[in-house]
From Swiss-Prot:
Protein name: Large ribosomal subunit protein bL21
One Pfam family cited in the UniProt record for this chain: Ribosomal_L21p
Record GO biological process: translation
Subunit structure: Part of the 50S ribosomal subunit. Contacts protein L20.
Gene, per the UniProt record: rplU
Family affiliation: Belongs to the bacterial ribosomal protein bL21 family.
Organism, as annotated: Leptothrix cholodnii (strain ATCC 51168 / LMG 8142 / SP-6) (Leptothrix discophora (strain SP-6))
Record keywords: Ribonucleoprotein, Ribosomal protein, RNA-binding, rRNA-binding
Amino acid sequence: MYAVIKTGGKQYKVAAGEKIKVEQIAAEVGQEIVIDQVLALGSGADLKIGTPLVEGATVTATVLAQGRHDKVRIFKMRRRKHYQKRQGHRQNFTELQISAVLG
């Protein structure tokens, strides 16, 4: 069974046993969280699509790690004007282990 969940403004297709990296969630490492924003549920040819959410469906996950992605370098330049601007950004993430898909 798989589910399409929404967290951090993004959508992820998940199944039990998978590991995913999502936008940072305020939770401790080892803590179990419940995601109730399930947009769709499916198993084989059977698919249940929510309007916008599937009622009673939840996904439970365990927090494996809190971390930061690799640095993204931003470089702006105006030719012939001696203008250069450098900037870097590292986005925070939470790594989750999907325990169960219920619904």
